[in-house]
Amino acid sequence: MEARMFWLLVVLLALASSSSAGEYVGLSANQCAVPAKDRVDCGYPQVTPEQCNNRGCCFDSSIXGVPWCFKPLQETECTF
């Protein structure tokens, strides 16, 4: 019985992590940390989060009056 509960927990955790990680497929959270005033529109009216992400863009609908689908920040390499 304990083994079944363990595997159930493993499956639930795997499902939860895959659904929450889907917001920025191929993008890091840092790339999508664009200040609202600096967002460059990357979508169109009524674009869904999935459609936006498929375009290689970030989606954040928590701030009204700014683009919700926007271009990510470009990651730069540090060279010393």
Swiss-Prot record:
Stretch forming the signal peptide: 1-21
Domain P-type, residue spans: 30-73
Keyword vocabulary terms for this entry: Cytoplasm, Disulfide bond, Extracellular matrix, Secreted, Signal
Major subcellular location class: secreted
GO biological process: maintenance of gastrointestinal epithelium
Disulfide pattern: C32-C58, C42-C57, C52-C69
Domain of life: Eukaryota
Compartment annotation: Secreted, Extracellular space, Extracellular matrix; Cytoplasm
InterPro entries found in the cross-reference section: P_trefoil_chordata (IPR017994), P_trefoil_CS (IPR017957), P_trefoil_dom (IPR000519), P_trefoil_dom_sf (IPR044913)
GO CC field: cytoplasm; extracellular space
Pfam families hit by this protein: Trefoil
Function recorded in the entry: Involved in the maintenance and repair of the intestinal mucosa. Promotes the mobility of epithelial cells in healing processes (motogen).
Subunit structure: Monomer. Homodimer; disulfide-linked.
Official protein name in the record: Trefoil factor 3
Source organism of the structure: Sus scrofa
Native organism taxonomy: Eukaryota, Metazoa, Chordata, Craniata, Vertebrata
The encoding gene: TFF3
